[in-house]
């Protein structure tokens, strides 16, 4: 069998060892399904190709995953879903168990949350209008359904290949009967992903009695069916409580791959497959083992860890095949897609270098396969489509992080070439950035954010250039890494839009968060601190030594009112700090660069308390493919990657009393927190392997070699901890 980075084939009989309560029991997949979280409650495996679960059939931003907890009806169960994105797509191959003929059957069914269940690798719900209990579980590339029908001669499974959400639209669909228990088909669509092709194969536990198919609303009787909107009804006679099971295998390459995906599940024992999925989730969750007396904290923590394993997702089938954007079939060992890099480069991707180290080479090689086809690294790739969503070229820090952490399994030279070429392309304003030293606001919207982010990405390229001895590039990328200064206005103390003539955009209101503007999903306050590679340089541009600290203080204390047509992404406010959107995520930790780590502790504890909960609306903003959750995981265990590609994690205020990190080497890194409580939130002292540790950060290397980190907490700040620049995190402008 083919090997994957998680399991060889499908381990249907994998049994978790160890003692104590299972960690999967602390995961609540409904967290984030309400409000603006945009998560889904369906069944999947870590990074699985299949995400099978319910769709409400409601159009709208808060249904970007196809499901929102506030809804009361279900239109079907589709096999692909996005986790926490701000744009809706996927929801491919919608199926619905129902009772009734095609002429009489209703489109959707009501349901009650009291009759709905979800856990890692499982989803179940009673469809009230049909008296059908629907359950589903999954392997990596195959979904397994179990439907308990009432006594009826018109029990039906409906395939609605024209089903789509938001801007997505089916362009062509296909359905063919192989025999009374086997079917194949495809759905091609366009939307956020312009060229999306999903092939599927179906195997039933019981032969159908009859099949009725509509093509573009017209009933057809033929051997195979092709049209924009294919609707197929598979009819059965059932006894009361009779369960019909169905396997649906997927491939993004061809029918052969979809049929092969069915072979991941070689049993009709639904409960066995469900247990196997839960066991696999248990194994992955156990890579971070925390100890806390607070059950709520444990539920939020392990649901957060679960969320970080929902993206990226496997794109290649069991043969290694996948389709490129032009329709060619390519082959790769393990190809991954769905990379929300503007979000995940900040903390979700760095977290994977700790918890999923063995997966990182597959991710980077997927980026390089994308580069081979497109000529540059992905920005926001969805099923290998470049959506060009958001700003920056943030595959660069992800690749740089892997190289600087000495993670092997990909070609460093090719990776550097891809990084450099992505920065030297003439699209997305890079030519303006090179020519002016900033993005002019009269040439492009979101110019301030783009300038800041390009400067950071260029710093990442600089680090790799130094490591690989590409000295011919170091001068130019050193210069470019400082271009953020070109959009800073000393008079107002804010980063501002600047036109080609060098003049600042007027009028200027730092509270205005509108679209379009010089800022991405925010205002001048929220985009005033993104210089993660050079916080010392940012401090120096203020007229007084404590100017940056005062500005940070003001961020958290000024009015939360904003002007303009504020986008809903700008949420979770403390003053103008907006935790519901990613540009704010590193800011609370910046105090440690200013030798005021106790201020970081205050804000980090406040953010964890206010903006994370174990309820459907427990996320204050979009989950964004794991980034919102990754912030919590890092913060709860006591540190955060302010500069994601630096290999440094800045201390904050650990929420849990202990965390044991299981490392790829088989060793562990233990974090023991002494005298921890709601009031004892300030770090008093730290030891690493029983030796005094005075730095306000810890390195990736120190974590991955294993050891014991002991953090002593207290109710008052220790004015002697983290107060010297030499013990602080690195900055480009700070020589050590």
Model regions and ranges:
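Bacterial Sec-dependent N-terminal signal peptides
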Residues: 1-21
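Accessory carbohydrate-recognition regions in carbohydrate-active enzymes
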Residues: 21-349, 353-397, 403-452, 460-486, ...
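ATP-dependent phospho-/nucleotidyl transfer catalytic cores
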Residues: 457
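Conserved catalytic core of nucleotide polymerization and phosphodiester-bond processing enzymes
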Residues: 673
């Amino acid at each position: 069998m083919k090997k994957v980075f998680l399991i060889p084939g499908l381990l249907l009989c994998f049994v978790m060892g160890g003692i104590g309560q299972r960690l999967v029991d602390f995961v609540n997949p409904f967290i984030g399904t309400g409000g603006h979280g945009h998560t889904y409650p369906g069944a999947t495996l870590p990074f699985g190709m299949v995400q099978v679960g319910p769709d409400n059939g409601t159009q709208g931003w808060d249904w970007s995953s196809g499901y929102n907890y506030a809804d009361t009806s279900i239109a079907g169960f589709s096999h692909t879903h996005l986790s926490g994105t701000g744009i809706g797509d996927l929801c491919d191959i919608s199926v619905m168990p129902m009772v009734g003929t095609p002429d009489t059957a209703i489109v959707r069914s009501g349901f009650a949350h009291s009759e709905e269940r979800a856990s890692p690798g499982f989803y179940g719900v009673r469809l009230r209008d049909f008296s059908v209990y629907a359950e589903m579980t999954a392997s990596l590339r195959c979904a397994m359904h179990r439907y308990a029908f009432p006594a009826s001669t018109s029990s039906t499974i409906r395939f609605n290949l024209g089903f789509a959400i938001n801007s997505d639209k089916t362009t062509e669909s296909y359905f063919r009967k192989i025999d009374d228990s086997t079917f194949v088909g495809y759905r091609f669509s366009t939307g956020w992903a312009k060229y999306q092709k999903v092939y599927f194969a179906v195997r039933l536990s019981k032969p159908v009695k009859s099949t009725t198919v509509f093509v573009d609303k017209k009933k057809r009787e033929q051997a195979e069916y092709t049209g924009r909107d294919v609707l197929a009804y598979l009819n059965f006679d059932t006894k009361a409580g009779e369960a019909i099971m169905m396997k649906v295998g997927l491939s993004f390459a061809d029918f052969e791959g979809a049929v092969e995906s069915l072979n991941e599940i070689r049993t009709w024992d639904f409960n066995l497959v469900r247990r196997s999925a839960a066991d696999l989730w248990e194994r992955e969750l156990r890579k971070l083992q925390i100890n806390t007396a607070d059950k709520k904290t444990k539920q939020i923590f392990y649901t957060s860890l679960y969320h970080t394993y929902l993206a990226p997702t496997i794109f290649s089938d069991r043969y290694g095949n996948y389709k490129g954007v032009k329709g060619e079939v390519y082959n790769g060992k393990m190809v991954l897609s769905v990379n929300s890099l503007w979000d995940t480069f900040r903390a979700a991707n760095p977290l994977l270098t700790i918890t999923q180290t063995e997966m990182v080479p597959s991710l980077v090689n997927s980026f390089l396969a994308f580069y081979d086809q497109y000529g540059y690294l992905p920005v926001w790739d969805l099923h290998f489509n470049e959506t060009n969503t958001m700003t920056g070229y943030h595959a660069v820090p992800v690749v740089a992080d892997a190289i600087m952490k000495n993670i092997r399994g990909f070609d460093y030279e090719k990776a550097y070439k891809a990084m450099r070429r992505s920065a030297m392309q003439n699209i997305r304003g890079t030519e303006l950035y090179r020519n002016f030293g900033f993005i002019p606001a009269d040439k492009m919207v979101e110019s301030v954010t783009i300038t800041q982010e390009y400067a950071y990405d260029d710093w990442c390229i600089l680090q790799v250039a130094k490591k690989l001895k590409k000295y011919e590039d170091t001068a130019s990328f050193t210069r470019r890494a400082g271009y953020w200064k070109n959009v800073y206005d000393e008079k107002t103390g804010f980063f501002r839009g600047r036109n080609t003539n060098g003049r600042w955009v007027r009028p200027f209101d730092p509270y205005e968060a509108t679209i379009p503007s010089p800022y991405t999903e925010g205002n001048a306050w929220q985009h005033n601190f993104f210089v993660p590679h050079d916080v010392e340089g940012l401090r120096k541009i203020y007229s007084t030594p404590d100017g940056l600290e005062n500005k940070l203080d003001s961020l958290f204390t000024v009015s939360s009112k904003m002007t303009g047509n504020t986008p809903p992404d700008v949420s979770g406010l403390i003053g103008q700090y907006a935790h519901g959107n990613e540009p704010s995520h590193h800011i609370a930790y910046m105090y440690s660069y200013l030798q005021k780590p106790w201020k970081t502790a205050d804000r980090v504890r406040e953010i964890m308390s206010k903006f994370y909960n174990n309820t459907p609306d427990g996320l204050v903003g979009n989950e964004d493919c794991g980034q919102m959750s990754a912030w919590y995981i890092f913060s709860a265990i006591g540190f955060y990657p302010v500069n994601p590609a630096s290999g440094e994690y800045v201390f904050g205020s650990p929420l849990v009393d202990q965390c044991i990190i299981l490392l790829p080497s088989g060793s562990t890194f233990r974090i023991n927190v002494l005298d921890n409580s709601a009031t004892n939130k300030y770090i008093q002292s730290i030891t690493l392997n029983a030796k005094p540790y005075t730095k306000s950060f810890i390195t990736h290397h120190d974590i991955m070699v294993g050891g014991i980190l002991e953090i002593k907490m207290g109710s008052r700040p220790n004015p002697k901890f983290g107060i010297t620049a030499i013990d602080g995190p690195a900055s480009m402008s700070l020589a050590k």
